[in-house]
Amino acid sequence: MIKFLNKNFRSIDNKDKFFFVILTIFPLSLVIGNTIINLIFFSAIISFFINFNDASKYFKNEIIIIFFFFFLTLIINVFFSIDPINSLPRVLKILVVLIFIIEIMRLFNKYDFSLLENIFKIWTLIFFIILIDVFFELYFGFNTIGFKSNLPTRVASFFGDELVVGAFIHGFALFTIGYLAFKKTNNL
């Protein structure tokens, strides 16, 4: 599998390699914390501007247009906010997420599925590792590396003090089930 990943990695344009790796480890960033998530979003912004000519064609996509109008309404709401200084960073974060989505769309449309399948394989592996850890913690009261949740009735898994493993599983279950269903229907 390593040879396959290495061969496929060589077929990626140099300007896309860094964001491809970042996108591959995105689920881990959710486990590690906000700093890594923000670094990933920052790298998406850099990749967006490096590939602006390719990315700009997605501005005509209906979903992106809807997100853009949503963003504009949030900007207008900032002006009517009681505390605009406090509201503006939250609104700008929406723009960063929009750029992140455009970069993902650009990568998925630029490369063929066999290359992108590596991302889904790694995401599925991370998902199942965390899922196994959740069941381990439910059964034994601590996770596989010895962490215990602050609340005995809640599971934290690798997230430490943050009790967000349910949201993680809920979010990535959609990707995992979608990937496995696509793979089964296309006999990959």
Located regions from the model:
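Transmembrane signal-anchor hairpin modules in multi-pass inner-membrane enzymes, especially those
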Residues: 1-89, 102, 106-124, 179-188
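Alpha-helical transmembrane segments of multi-pass inner-membrane proteins
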Residues: 24-26, 75, 117-150, 157-188
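Membrane-interface micro-motifs in multi-pass membrane enzymes
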Residues: 31-39, 90, 156-170
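Non-cytosolic membrane-interface motifs at loop->transmembrane helix junctions
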Residues: 86-93, 150-156
